[in-house]
Amino acid sequence: MKKRAKRELKEEEDKEEVLCCCEYVNRHGERSHVAACCCDCEDLDDVCDRFLKREPQKPESLSHVSAVVFDRIRVPWFWGGARKLDLSIVPPLVLLPALLHLAAFHFLLGVLVLTALPGLVLWYYFFTHRKKGRTLFFLSLALFSLGYMYYLFVSEVFPRGDVGQGELAAVSVGVSLTLLTLIYTKRDPGIVRLDQQAVHSTVTYYSTLPDNDSSFNGGMQEVSMTAVQRIGSSEQEGLELKESGRRNWCSVCRVVRPPRAGHCRICGVCVLRLDHHCVWINNCVGQANHVSFLLTLVFFLLTSLYGIGLVLRSVCPQQNVLTALLYCPGVYTHYSSALCFTCAWYCSIVTGGLLHLLLVQIINISYNVTEREARVALREKTARSACWGLVVDTGVYSRGLWSNWSEFMSMGDKLRLSSPTDLV
């Protein structure tokens, strides 16, 4: 008994020990080491054994092997043990520069690459969206695109002498502001906590109080109610409260969602005033980070449009900036000019998609409706839509353009100032 107790005590002490930079806890909850990544893999041994014996593989064998491989691909980290490396961040780092340089060789190659690239990204989006899984592919593509375009602007466009120091500084400030707002957007979107089960909606409803009303005497209202009426009223309120709680109850997070909150199946959490899950930031957009998300879009679009104008003015000096994308003779004469022109086209495609996203966001905020509420209302046919579904008005929370924008800009402050003591 003493030996058993000592062994259990030693195991508990081992678990409580801090992981070194090369250690980690695997998917089975066991302590492992990066150096042992090629050791003791029963799933891989079973697959190889069946292959050599020419026996049929189990249906789940390959998925188990891939799970083990992805779990063991880690990099040493200074604190918290070795970190898992998501391989989905690698393709953008390799394919984006290769495809852009390939497209710069000839006009037809540019058309082929710039047409196929958005199609491949959309295919991968629908593929991952159907599986409801998280991926760093889109965040990696967004960050690397921003960094790589800035690198080419500094290394290829600026040395040509057509861009001044002030213009370079303006682009640098725009990139910095975009990254700062993106970092802030990546924080907590407003996750519904266990102590927020009774949080009410931040939407304020206004009603006029009659000046001359016989039921109001000096601010006091006389109400007469019999015992039977009180019992009936209490039962009715209890049934309504129970029905509301059942409707807003999240069986996954085990919390009662406040009004306008929603559950994200990708992140696996409930978010206050959930708008949508944005794959480009690998995070939800909710009450706490919606304003910073909008600022990120604005800063990026302003920087991108300004940078595209500077690039086209440099590589197509004889053409108008508005028409240079469609007609720029002699741009493929020099490889450097062709590469800058190709990158300008790539940025224009990305900018066009984000302009559409910004337009949808502005319209939804003006009508005080989230993207999630708009989709649900269109599916249930409970909203008015216009402009081919671009404008969706549910008529539930809208209180006018100015009030809707005021509520949107201040909803993050209400979330920070709220506490369990002032919630009723």
Predicted regions and their residues:
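Short Cys/His-rich Zn2+-coordinating modules
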Residues: 227-237, 245-251
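Eukaryotic intrinsically disordered and solvent-exposed regulatory patches
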Residues: 169, 235-237, 250, 265, ...
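Hydrophobic alpha-helical transmembrane segments that serve as membrane anchors
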Residues: 2-211, 287-424
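Interfacial segments of multi-pass membrane proteins
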Residues: 283-284
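Short cysteine-rich clusters marking metal-coordination/redox-active sites
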Residues: 250-253, 264-267, 278
